[in-house]
Regions:
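Active-site neighborhoods and metal-handling regions in enzymes and metal-associated proteins
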Residues: 1-391
Length: 391
């Protein structure tokens, strides 16, 4: 069976598209930087996911590109990466900050010369400003003290927000695997198991069925921990009357979709049932009202107003969708302040989170924007609805 992945030629297409956008902004070159945990921008162009060290891709307006890695990753990057030219820069070293006294590294000057960005008065764009570490920024400034360094993350949002057919295939495959993992975790849930034991069940299933890694640190939270919008699973023992929040994910060639739903160990009652059902209602409303051609702030504004009208404003945490792709949460978000239009093949997680007095709840799935609605990549929530295990 052929593995679902991004073909090599698509990486070259991405670099070519980026180079045109770099030139159109009047830049000489764009640098994107990634870490092990937030690998997306460098991997988007190179297929390379760093370990311990940082990685970067430098793209010139000329169309040439070079993969930049730390001192221990030269062979690793050449074996895994999709960019032929690899340079080793000390600025991309790991956080232990080794001196590497015997190393003769490449330099930023060599990298910029390679992509055709020569001279001193360069215009350099940072395509991933948030991920850019201080040693890398200082290295740029020391090498090019006369350069104009600006943020051009809008280039990366423009490239990554609309997915190709190969990207959509990776996302679909991830959801197929997450459905299998969710089934097995629900079957394994019982009073007395720990949150981390259930994470172990999910990890086994995703690897057995073709995932390269977790798409996110998988969530199995119980009772008070379900109030956490983001968190980590623990050794906490799950009780027979607990509400358990699942958010499971599988990574396919970097693409990281997730499914989230609450599970009642006993029976859904009282405030818990009311809030969980309201959360599901808002989740379904969001899905039904998304389509290409509408302003991205329309749904969030209506979403927030519906919370207010229903008396749940105090339970509102954030609004209804965030971009998804190589990172489970990526730009753009849909917020009340958003100022872009929804376009076909933008992909989002419909992420509906509500916080109660002693618990929280999330219903979550992935969709692609289409002309007259959305393509949903899982029907798991529709098929199973509110799960009560009856312990």
């Amino acid at each position: 069976m052929q593995r679902i992945c991004i073909p090599d030629y698509e990486y070259q297409e991405r670099i070519a598209k980026a180079a045109k956008l770099v030139a159109a902004k009047g830049l000489d070159a764009m640098l994107v930087v990634s870490t092990e945990s937030d690998y997306a921008n460098a991997r988007y162009f190179s297929g390379f996911w760093p370990l311990f060290e940082r990685a970067g891709v430098l793209i010139g307006a000329s169309g040439k590109a070079v993969l930049l890695v730390g001192p221990e990753s030269a062979i690793f990057a050449k074996d895994f990466g999709k960019i032929d030219k690899v340079m080793v820069l000390k600025e991309f070293r790991e956080s232990a900050d080794p001196a590497y006294p015997e190393l003769v590294p490449d330099t930023f000057k060599m990298a910029f010369d390679y992509v055709g960005a020569t001279g001193e008065n360069l215009k350099i764009g940072l395509g991933s400003y948030v991920e850019c570490t201080l040693p890398i920024m200082e290295g740029l400034k020391d090498t090019f003290p006369k350069a104009e360094i600006s943020i051009c993350s809008d280039i990366m949002v423009a490239l990554r927000s609309i997915k190709s057919e190969n990207e959509l295939a990776c996302i679909r495959e991830g959801f197929r695997i997450v459905e299998l993992a969710t089934d097995e975790v629900v079957k394994a849930l019982k009073p007395g198991v720990t949150e981390l034991q259930m994470v172990g069940v999910a990890q086994r299933v995703i690897y057995e069925n073709g995932a390269e890694y977790e798409g996110l640190p998988m969530y199995v939270f119980s009772e008070s921990s379900t109030r956490h919008a983001i968190s980590r699973s623990t050794y906490k023992v799950i009780g027979k009357n607990d509400i358990v929040q699942l958010n499971l994910s599988a990574k396919i060639d970097g693409y990281s979709p997730a499914i989230g739903l609450p599970v009642f160990m006993g029976k859904a009652e009282g405030e818990k049932k009311e809030i969980v059902e309201f959360c599901l209602k808002m989740h379904n409303w969001t899905t039904e009202n998304l389509k290409a051609g509408i302003p991205a702030d329309r749904i969030p504004k209506q979403f927030l107003q519906m919370f207010k009208d229903a008396g749940y404003e105090k339970n509102y945490v954030y609004g209804p969708c965030h971009g998804t792709g190589m990172i489970e949460v990526e730009a753009p978000w849909m917020e009340t302040s958003s100022d872009y239009m929804l376009k076909e093949n933008m992909t989002f997680q419909v992420d509906t989170f509500v916080s109660g007095s002693t618990f929280g709840c999330r219903w979550e799935k992935g969709i692609a924007i289409k002309e007259n609605g959305v393509e949903s990549y899982t029907d798991y929530l529709e098929k199973h609805g509110l799960i009560e295990l009856g312990f």
